[in-house]
Amino acid sequence: VTKSGPSASRGNLLVTLALERLTGEPEETYQNDAMRRGSEMEPLARGAYEAHTGELVEHIAFVLHPSLPFVGVSPDGLLGADGLLEIKCPSSQEKHLEALRNATHADEYRWQIQGQLWVTGRQWCDAVSYDPRFPDGLRLAIHRVTRDEPAIAALEAACIKADAEVAAIVSELNSMRKAA
């Protein structure tokens, strides 16, 4: 949502989700060069995190919300009984420097991290920025983020509202099909 109201990208996402429900076929996922780089570097970052912290990262794929089956997340790993891992491997060295100095990566991905904490029921997430181009001791920026219950409540309400909007679009399209 922007200052002036819902963003165009939100509307586009709702239409995409409605079409996926209607057709049963998922939309192709977009991946740019920076996203590909992040996916390729993630195992290195995970290994560096494990070596630095001594924590063993449990790999996990996709997690659905226990009572809202239209909500799911894919954290980069589970940590112990209460933690998550979210890794970013920025292509920009300046972004990694900012993460080292100000933990900006945790703020930039706040909603993603809070969503992961909400869906998994975990209590905290280590938000990691990793850049192997930096010298030893500066390749990892780790910032621990804890659950923000008011933010999670707002996220839950927004997801429920979005699901109702998607259902309305699907209903409208099904009505058009029956009328034809």
Question: PLM ranges: what are they?
Answer:
Residues 35-57:
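Acidic-basic catalytic patches of nuclease active cores, encompassing PD-(D/E)XK
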Residues 53-75, 79-169:
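Nucleic-acid nuclease catalytic cores
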